[in-house]
A protein has these predicted regions:
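HotDog/MaoC-like acyl-thioester-processing domains
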Residues: 1-12, 89-140
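Catalytic strand-loop segment that frames the active site of acyl-thioester-processing enzymes
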Residues: 1-53
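Hydrophobic beta-strand-centered segment that forms part of the acyl-chain substrate-binding groove
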Residues: 44-53, 60-100
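A generic structural signal for short beta-strands and their flanking turns/coil linkers
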Residues: 14, 22, 32, 76-80, ...
């Protein structure tokens, strides 16, 4: 967890390798068995040309980064807005980076506004977005 919450501070990156097995396990956990995710034969005959990871799997990795930085504050008081740019595919290695853009205080509560991006090993943007985390001012 962050010991100091200040504007411009980078969050610890998360790096994850996407495999078909991870995609299949996520499908089981989420109940989302859309064939674009789990049926390689079906997906090969679509414009995407193969299976892709669930968007929410990618966001789970963003949430992992935010939980590492803000702990329970993220889990209970965090909000996320994301834009999906490209699909993540089996074989991709995703790197999720984030930073604190600004810290605002209202009464005895502080808010950290963060930005994040998720890129694959080719540097292609997969997901980008913003988060807001509410936390007690004494953690600042």
């Amino acid at each position: 967890m962050l010991t100091e919450i200040q504007e411009g501070k980078a969050l610890n990156s998360v790096v994850k390798h996407i495999t078909q097995e991870k995609i299949n396990l996520y499908a089981e956990a989420s109940g989302d068995f859309n064939p674009i995710h789990v049926d390689e034969s079906f997906a090969a005959n679509t414009p995407l040309g193969g299976t892709i990871a669930h968007g929410m799997l990618n966001l789970a990795y963003v949430s992992e980064m935010m939980t590492s930085a803000f702990g329970r504050s993220w889990l209970s008081e965090g909000k996320l807005r994301a834009k999906f740019k490209e699909p993540a595919r089996p074989g991709d290695t995703l790197t999720i980076n984030g930073k604190i853009d600004c810290v605002e205080q209202k009464d005895d509560v502080s808010y950290a506004n963060c930005s994040f991006e998720c890129r694959n090993q080719k540097g292609e943007m997969i997901v980008t977005g913003e988060t807001i985390v509410k936390f007690s001012s004494d953690k600042k």
